[in-house]
A protein has these predicted regions:
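C-terminal structural segment of proteins
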Residues: 1-276
Length: 276
């Protein structure tokens, strides 16, 4: 299938990109790994595509106060292989290792995945679990959207139609804390049937889940007995039956993955001096 006709512009600065995006029915193109398939299937039919790949300075990965800021054009591969993120917030590369395949990671962007807001994708639940944020630029200037407010529905984010996401902020892992991420998919690189990430910080235990709700879900399991954690999590999840899996199998995967990621995150915390 071929895309419906559209106009194309490639601005050379952020102000020009924001101005171009003011046109009706316009869409931003960064890595294109979500938008281009939607165009090809005519599930998206913008009148104008604004390609931001000509805007300098959006591909950086930098340490800032309390964490790491990832630019809108930083490719998944660069984020996955970043020594800075491996040191400051290892949950990000741990999850990115499960994202698609190398050819897609070489082009796709981490920030683009956040804006796409697919609840079956890894990056939205990671940002939500880490309580990170997204910076966006629009006609009214720049604003920050917290992860709790960012994901508002299936494939729907709080980024306005006239705004461009410029960077994501991933908070640093607290000293002595541990993280883990795992998922189950029919084939490596496919969308997960269920995925889970955990952050264990002292006595605090939080687990985030993908593919079991319309939006990324984070459950605080602090103080919950190990045998009861999965049941406590399932109260907040919506494991549905579809062509990929039954609801019963997804619930079983929640049980397995909850125990697994909490155990691994606890071991990682102990290894970093955060013994419990």
């Amino acid at each position: 299938v071929k895309p419906a006709p559209f106009d194309y512009v490639r601005p050379t600065d952020l102000a020009g990109a924001v101005a171009a995006l003011a046109a009706p029915d316009s869409k931003v193109l960064a890595g294109g790994q979500s938008l281009v398939p939607l165009l090809s299937m005519r599930l998206a039919a913008p009148s104008l595509v604004v390609d931001i790949n000509g805007v300098p300075g959006l591909d950086t990965i930098t340490e800032v106060g309390g964490g790491v800021r990832v630019g809108a054009l930083a490719r998944h591969t660069a984020v996955l292989e970043s020594p800075l993120l491996a040191r400051v917030q290892p949950l990000v590369p741990a999850a990115l290792a499960h994202v698609a395949h190398p050819t897609i990671r070489n082009r796709g962007t981490t920030v683009g995945s956040l804006v796409h807001a697919d609840a079956a994708a890894e990056m939205p639940v990671v940002l939500r679990l880490l309580e990170g944020s997204l910076d966006v630029e629009g006609p009214a200037g720049r604003r920050t959207i917290g992860a709790r407010e960012l994901f508002v529905g299936p494939l729907e984010s709080a980024v306005g139609p006239d705004e461009i996401a410029v960077s994501a902020f991933f908070p640093a892992l607290p000293a002595g804390a541990g993280v883990a991420f795992d998922e189950v998919a029919r084939r490596h690189g496919d969308y997960a049937l269920v995925g889970a990430g955990a952050v264990v910080d002292g006595d605090r235990i939080r687990v985030g889940y993908l593919s079991v709700s319309d939006v990324p879900v984070v459950v605080d399991l602090t103080g919950v007995a190990p045998a009861d954690r999965a049941d406590a999590a399932l109260e907040h999840l919506d494991a549905a039956t579809d062509i990929h899996s039954t609801a019963a199998y997804r619930r079983q995967l929640v049980r397995v993955l909850t125990d697994r990621v909490v155990a691994v995150a606890t071991r990682n915390a102990t290894a970093q001096g955060g013994g419990r």
